[in-house]
Regions:
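Structure-specific nucleic-acid interaction/processing domains
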Residues: 2-150
Length: 150
């Protein structure tokens, strides 16, 4: 098996047609992304931050450490999407960054905007099943309100 060099990772995110690496983060806080199942065409839109803040192990008080998040390995939070990735394999999913943002607020806003612009709760594939893995927006609007039980 080929070794993965610095800046390379399995099934990398693409941004504007090129592979996105840690060197491209600059001062961006997070990104909005689309994951597409290349077999079915079903998609997922979400957001991810480049850093995470955690309390150090055994740490006392309010001290927190900032480190790079798991964004390179991240495949979304949808249980349905995760199940399909397990069934189909990571190679059958395209991961693309839609937009990059410098603040938490702008990242969150753009994710919500994209969810509504793409009608993730109401769009369906040719076979009538949901076109998106997203099952809710903001924990307030739900796909189940638009689709019959599957």
């Amino acid at each position: 098996m080929e070794s993965i060099g610095e800046g390379d990772y399995e099934n990398p995110w693409s941004y504007q047609g090129t592979t996105f690496t840690s060197d491209d983060i600059d001062d961006f806080f997070g990104f909005v992304y689309r994951i597409t199942n290349l077999q079915t065409g079903k998609q997922y839109i979400g957001r991810k931050y480049f850093t995470q803040r955690r309390k150090p192990r055994g740490g006392k008080g309010k001290r927190r450490v900032t480190s790079e998040s798991d964004w390179k390995k991240y495949y979304g939070s949808s249980p349905e999407l995760k199940a399909d990735i397990k069934d189909f394999g990571k190679g059958l999913f395209r991961r693309e960054i839609i937009s990059l943002h410098k603040t938490l607020g702008k990242t969150n806003y753009e994710e919500t905007r994209q969810l509504f612009l793409n009608n993730v709760l109401t769009e369906s594939l040719d076979d009538g099943t949901p076109a998106y893995y997203n099952s809710n927006v903001l924990g307030r609007y739900y796909r189940k309100d638009y689709f019959e039980s599957q």
